Amino acid sequence: MDLSRFLDRSRGQCRADVAVEALATGVSTPTVYVLDCDGYYPGFNFLFGLAQPALRTAVVFTARLRGPLFAERLAKEIVHESGHLYGLGHCSNPKCVMYFSNTLLDTDRKTAYFCERCRRKLFARYLNP
């Protein structure tokens, strides 16, 4: 995929909202795209990912996830953005996958799983309508 259409050359980063909007075309089911670049959104220096539930589309950026824990970090961020696509917000539990990762250490400390509260929200929304 050509990432240049999302790239802000002055920053050397891909703009997250532009990527989501462009990739959302034709999406009918919740979809998370993994992009091999560094992402940002106005007001933030960087993002690990961004979801737009109304568009059923999210992106996860790999640049800052690299290192020996890359696969684990990537999995956590994909699950996190998927949680947003299914209606979850950020969680205050630092071990929950829905906890907002402000740093890579935050991502490393949290698990790849939803906490009990977030699981209940998902079950209530999708299993007990």
What kind of feature is each model-predicted range?
Residues 1-78, 85, 89:
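Metzincin-family zinc-dependent endopeptidase catalytic domain
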Residues 42, 80, 97-100:
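Generic, low-specificity signal for short hydrophobic/alpha-helical stretches with a mild N-terminal bias
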Residues 47-73, 88-129:
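Metalloprotease/metallohydrolase-associated module, dominated by Zn2+-dependent proteases
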